[in-house]
């Protein structure tokens, strides 16, 4: 892992501004260019002397900077490019949040139109509004970045950004964002694929989870920490997979008045049009999930499958629950609960679950799982099915109320409490056979979004329902001016 303090900055002789325009798909760049015709203020500076550093250090030999609103320091447009041992600095703002968040306006490093951009041993610093650090936009576009450090300080300025079907592959990065609505690992309209292996990812701003997913995002062997927001947010028909990850979340500030709850992981559908409707997915294998404030999981206005296998889960908030599936301000009132399929494999899990009267839970315990907690201790009437495989167990910590149960004679330990199954008291030591609750993978209603998250959907959808989600392709014509703040 890179130590930020070990990045070397050396004395240098300022070179003349170097401007090169990215041309055909066959052209290849080699890391000494500021490659955007639109980036007229990008400059490159040589580092004339070098200092040998350790294996974890980054040796900087060139600097590229850009201070023009809306422009890039580096742009790869339909070509294969490689850069290494650079420091990239971006200041300036974007006039349009949509242009910046959807299409890469004002990002420090931008790849588009099927480009393949490889970055290694670089430092990226941005200080501007809507100044994302590294952006992959469009089908066929791939950014590969390794052994690098990214810092963003402005609002709405993520570390890694992927939209429009782009691909981002990251290895051993250190990313730190301090602005509001600035996730370390971000996606937006049109989604894409993000693969992260190794590194450290930290966010400090309000509305700045470590991961905000409207894509398929996989992170392995990494440390992730949010000091103000959720650790992970998944919106709509998208996914986050964590393998051997240490995730720490302290959601202690509100980015919206649509929900009163705090949580480590939020899974929802905003109805903004930025994420397709359908089944959201959260998978975590190994590693740890530590929550400092509120609940561990919150699901609202969407259907989701959550799979946890051999994860150490700690909730430091004694008043928080493990899972809350409930209505909030997104979607249509009365039809915007959470619908959850929860799979626990080889888990020791402690924590209560709350499923409100318009929400649904199917919980499956397998592979020697022990769950200690209460489900709907206040009898809030949500539909709940529990299935306990032989060798797994549910230990009650309070009276609990569920709809249906499948277990063998050893699957339930009442522990002095009462379990009601569809209103009938369960007798410990008996078998039970029930049926899962059908979950339909669609969200309900149209709703605005929290400040810093996607806004209202476009008008013109039939019957008051959302239309097809945008593909992420840039619309024709001039870009919109202004635009709402984004996540």
Put a short name on every predicted segment.
Residues 377-383, 396-406, 419-421, 426:
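Surface-exposed loop/turn positions within long extracellular repeat scaffolds
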Residues 27-47, 271-273, 331, 445-487:
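Disordered, low-complexity segments in secreted/periplasmic proteins that are enriched in proline
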Residues 65-77:
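Beta-strand-rich domains and repeat architectures in extracellular enzymes and scaffolds
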């Amino acid at each position: 892992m890179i130590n930020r303090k070990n990045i070397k900055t050396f004395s240098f002789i300022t070179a003349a501004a170097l401007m090169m325009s990215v041309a055909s798909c066959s052209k290849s760049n080699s890391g000494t260019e500021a490659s955007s015709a639109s980036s007229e203020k990008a400059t490159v500076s040589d580092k004339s002397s070098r200092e040998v550093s350790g294996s974890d250090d980054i040796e900087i030999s060139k600097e590229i900077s850009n201070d023009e609103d809306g422009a890039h320091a580096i742009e790869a447009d339909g070509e294969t490019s490689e850069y290494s041992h650079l420091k990239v600095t971006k200041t300036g703002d974007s006039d349009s949040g949509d242009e910046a968040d959807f299409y890469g306006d004002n990002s420090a490093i931008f790849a588009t139109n099927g480009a393949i951009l490889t970055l290694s041993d670089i430092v990226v610093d941005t200080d501007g509004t809507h100044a994302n650090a590294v952006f992959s936009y469009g089908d066929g576009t791939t950014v590969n970045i390794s052994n690098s450090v990214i810092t963003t300080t402005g609002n709405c300025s993520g570390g890694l950004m992927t939209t429009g079907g782009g691909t981002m592959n990251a290895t051993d990065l250190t990313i730190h964002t301090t602005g509001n609505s600035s996730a370390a690992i971000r996606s937006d309209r049109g989604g894409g694929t993000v693969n992260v292996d190794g590194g450290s990812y930290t966010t400090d701003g309000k509305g700045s989870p470590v991961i905000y997913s409207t894509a398929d995002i996989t992170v392995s062997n990494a440390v992730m920490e949010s000091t103000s927001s959720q650790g992970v947010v998944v919106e709509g028909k998208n996914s986050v997979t964590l393998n051997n990850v240490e995730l720490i979340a302290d959601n202690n500030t509100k980015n919206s008045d649509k929900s009163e709850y705090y949580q480590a992981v939020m899974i929802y559908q905003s109805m903004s049009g930025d994420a397709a409707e359908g089944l959201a997915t959260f998978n975590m294998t190994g590693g740890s999930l530590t929550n400092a404030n509120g609940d561990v999981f919150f699901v609202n206005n969407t259907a989701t499958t959550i799979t946890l296998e051999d994860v150490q889960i700690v909730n430091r908030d004694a008043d928080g629950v493990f899972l809350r599936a409930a209505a909030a301000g997104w979607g249509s009132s009365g039809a915007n609960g959470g619908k959850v399929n929860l799979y626990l494999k080889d888990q020791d899990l402690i924590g209560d679950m709350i499923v409100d009267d318009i929400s649904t839970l199917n919980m499956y315990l397998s592979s020697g799982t022990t769950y200690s907690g209460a489900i709907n201790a206040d009898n809030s009437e949500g539909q709940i099915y529990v299935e306990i495989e032989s060798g797994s167990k549910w230990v009650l910590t309070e009276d609990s109320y569920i709809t249906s149960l499948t277990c063998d004679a050893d699957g339930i330990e009442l522990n002095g409490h009462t379990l009601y199954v569809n209103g009938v008291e369960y007798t410990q030591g008996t078998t039970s056979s029930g049926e899962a609750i059908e979950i339909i993978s669609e969200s309900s209603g149209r709703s605005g979004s929290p400040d810093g998250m996607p806004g209202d959907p476009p008008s013109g959808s039939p019957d008051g329902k959302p239309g097809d989600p945008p593909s992420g392709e840039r619309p024709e014509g001039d870009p919109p001016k202004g635009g709402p703040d984004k996540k």
